[in-house]
Amino acid sequence: MVMGFVNVLKPPGLTSHDVVQNLRRLLKVKRIGHGGTLDPLAAGVLPVAVGTATRLLEYLQGGDKAYRAEFILGLKTDTQDLGGRVLARKPCPPFTEKDLQAATRPFTGTIRQVPPMVSAVHYQGRRLYELAREGLEVERPARQVTIHEFRLIRAWPDGPYYRALIDITCSRGTYIRTLGADWGDYLGVGATLAFLLRTRAGSFRLTDAWTLEEIAGAIDRGERTFLLPPAAGLAHLPVIIVPGEFIRHVSNGVAIKGDVCRPLPSLREGDIVRLETGEGQLLALARVEPDTRGSFLLKPHKVLK
């Protein structure tokens, strides 16, 4: 049975769903899903779960993401990227890199962001991008996101505009195009996303990603080195080693007492942990629950069989 994660290097021009469809064809497996949509025009890391690893996607998506983006300052479009209709053009003053970096400060830390109309957010049973295609715009509530890093790499004039290359590390649910557009508005000139590369999604990094062509070549050679174990996408969750005599309990979904496992990380009620064998095999994800005797239980939440 094929099961695990694939760290795919998505090319520009394909949707995230296109990548999933390609992998279904290559691996001859239907149960495949991706760990967070990457815009069609963007490139970079797209984690994909195969087989029963799809049950872990909700935990994978909790990890932070990192991007390298290029913005054009002085240009505004209705989609906040170069695929949209131009709304405004405004010549830029002679910005310095110090000016531009200082203007990123209001957009670091915990901020509120309004999803763009071209997003996949649901509104009354429909996706926002479906409404946008019909020329409609609706009110969208702002969402809280966290920007850990908004760092200017380089900026240079380009005719009446400025181009800025930025490294961004952020929480899930952050819209990079909107972050850039809001930054441009703060600078008084507007901004549009010109290029986007996702360099990290959780523990999946660009340097380890596989192109679809590389995956196809490996399959032709009878290799599966691109297929990572289920635990590969869960590095942010604490690991607890289950003693051999309790492995069957966990595999059957039976809760075990925390004090039978050693060593134990610092845990709180409600935490999600990885239960593994001494050999590193992922048995289940478990939730920490209180015990009547003042200790705690590890209740299997997602069992891998």
From Swiss-Prot:
Gene Ontology MF: a single term: tRNA pseudouridine(55) synthase activity
GO biological process: mRNA pseudouridine synthesis; tRNA pseudouridine synthesis
NCBIfam families: TruB (TIGR00431)
Name of the gene: truB
Keyword Isomerase attached: yes
Enzyme nomenclature, EC number: 5.4.99.25
Domain PUA: 237-305
Function: Responsible for synthesis of pseudouridine from uracil-55 in the psi GC loop of transfer RNAs.
Enzyme active site: D39
Species name: Moorella thermoacetica (strain ATCC 39073 / JCM 9320)
Entry's family note: Belongs to the pseudouridine synthase TruB family. Type 1 subfamily.
Protein name: tRNA pseudouridine synthase B
Coiled coil: none
Broadest EC class assigned to this enzyme: isomerase
A Pfam family the protein falls into: TruB_C_2
Claim: tRNA processing is one of the keywords in the record: yes
UniProt KW keywords: Isomerase, tRNA processing
InterPro entries, sorted: PsdUridine_synth_cat_dom_sf, PsdUridine_synth_N, PUA_sf, tRNA_psdUridine_synth_TruB, TruB_C
Catalysis performed (reactions): uridine(55) in tRNA = pseudouridine(55) in tRNA
Domain of life per record: Bacteria
